[in-house]
Amino acid sequence: MSNLKNNLTWVEINKASLINNIRLFRGLIGRKTILAPCVKANAYGHDMVKTAKIALAAGADWLNVNAVFEAVELRKAGIKSPIYIMGYVMKKDIADAVRLNCRLVAYNKETIAELGKATKRLHKKAIIHLKIETGNNRQGILMGNLMDFVEYVKKFPQITIEGISTHFANIEDISVSEAKRFLKNKNSEKSFQLAAYPLFQLENFRHAIALLKNAGINVPIRHCANSAATMLFPETHFDMVRPGIAFYGLWPSEETKVAFQKMHKGAKLMPVLSWRTRIAQIKNVSAGSYIGYGCTYRAKKNMKIAILPIGYYDGFDRGFSNKGYVLIRGKRAKICGRVCMNITMVDVTDIPSARVEDTATILGKDGREEITADELAQIAGTINYEITTRINEKIPRIVI
């Protein structure tokens, strides 16, 4: 903890919490299923390299990223585990992905053609995972085009189809009991259709697997489970799971949280990330004075405010203006006025012991109080994913 004293604004990564979450997922899937956490987008704001190293040491098997530059960063950090690139790889970057021994998602013939050229040029084999369109309508091979796509891949003997995958559209938003009831009753009401949509997608995915199997093509690694699927639906685990937000101790949704806690008494996710800054100034403000840009906050009485050196440049959403709180000396201090690019003002009238360079907690615990990513997301009108992912990468991440 000593190195924290040297930082003006910083993010803490709790190693014990991350290990807890890793063990929780391992307990859910068993030893034979590949545990492949998503560390894309700077590990959802948690620091990709530091998080990846902790995860692998604690029992994760693979790492999932979105782009080649992320894979480059991991390899430069000495990480040798399998890396699966889930996002589109530009033609100019395909050779780099092959050199790095990465698995690539595949759904375009253009990618396959360029991959074929790269394997010849480099005298290396390439490994791909087919992405199947089952109902999310993002990237993926349409079911009717699957066999034609596979036949095209066969033209390139240096390319191996190792995996087949898909991605759910709303599995984190559904009620497990409703979904199960739909399967039994085949009810046509809209709410039940939406509840069963992940299961509709799962049936499509199984159909794709069967098409390949009937054609004599055995794909060894089948995967479709994100955080919610891994936690609630064992039938989605197949050979590999890809937890994302829950790996970092945050719930994909309230529905997932409620259902999981009913199914697994005593098991819990532990948030990994805390975000803190320091008071830069404390000043008195007279009743009737305005605070901040736009004069959106007017002091109703004499008050004391603290100036914090943090703003929307750092990833602290402007939507927190006049709404959000920070924690100072274990108490809530309300934001006064607009969140600025580099500065935020908070009311410390009722925290008389507050001093310059005291810690202000943006996200996390301070004493008995806590500000969660879900609370911040609700204020900003977004999701917890965005709250942590948008924290500026230049802010130091410190493992504690």
Where in this protein do the model-derived segments appear?
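Active-site phosphate/pyrophosphate- and oxyanion-stabilizing loops and adjacent acidic/basic residues
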Residues: R23, E151, Y385
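Active-site-proximal beta-alpha core segment in soluble small-molecule metabolic enzymes
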Residues: S2-K5, T9-K15, I19, G27, ...
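Active-site anion/phosphate-binding pocket segments in diverse small-molecule metabolic enzymes
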Residues: S2-K15, I19, F69-E70, V89, ...
